Amino acid sequence: MMSGPRLTHIDSAGEAHMVDVGDKAETERVAAAEGFVRMRPETLALILEGNAKKGDVIGTARLAGIMAAKQTSNLIPLCHPLMLTKVSVDIVPDDALPGLRIEAMAKLKGRTGVEMEALTAVSIACLTIYDMAKAADREMEIGGIRLVSKSGGKSGDYRRGGDQD
């Protein structure tokens, strides 16, 4: 039998389980993720001018992303509850898209990584943007949600290479 990548959440009987991280060393863990919401140029202008019916789209989406990162273990069944030390969500306009680009970073000192927290922050920020602007543009597209980098832990550091939009 070949040795290679394996699914850590599946036991020898093929059953899903939560990984035991009790014996792992505590290290600083940082992960970054990104995504985008593509929309019509006039929808982007509406958001940037602060004229969306539901209010401050970017500010609300930023807070939603931060709140979501803190709730990841309640949303994804096998994620450990974590004591995050920092979560940031940055949302910037991109006229070339056109739309908004979302980047999130999650950090802690602990025994397991924060990739899912960063990805959850981006996902929920994107969904919040869609929710708040859907009255103006139901054809918005959410995409490109992916891990950009992670550091810390036994598996080492990772940085996504090349532009893969």
From Swiss-Prot:
Catalytic function, reaction form: (8S)-3',8-cyclo-7,8-dihydroguanosine 5'-triphosphate = cyclic pyranopterin phosphate + diphosphate
Pfam families (alphabetical): MoaC
Segments passing through the bilayer: none
Residues annotated for substrate binding in this entry: 78-80, 116-117
Gene Ontology MF terms: cyclic pyranopterin monophosphate synthase activity
Biological role: Catalyzes the conversion of (8S)-3',8-cyclo-7,8-dihydroguanosine 5'-triphosphate to cyclic pyranopterin monophosphate (cPMP).
Protein name: Cyclic pyranopterin monophosphate synthase
Native source species: Sinorhizobium fredii (strain NBRC 101917 / NGR234)
Species classification: Bacteria, Pseudomonadati, Pseudomonadota, Alphaproteobacteria, Hyphomicrobiales
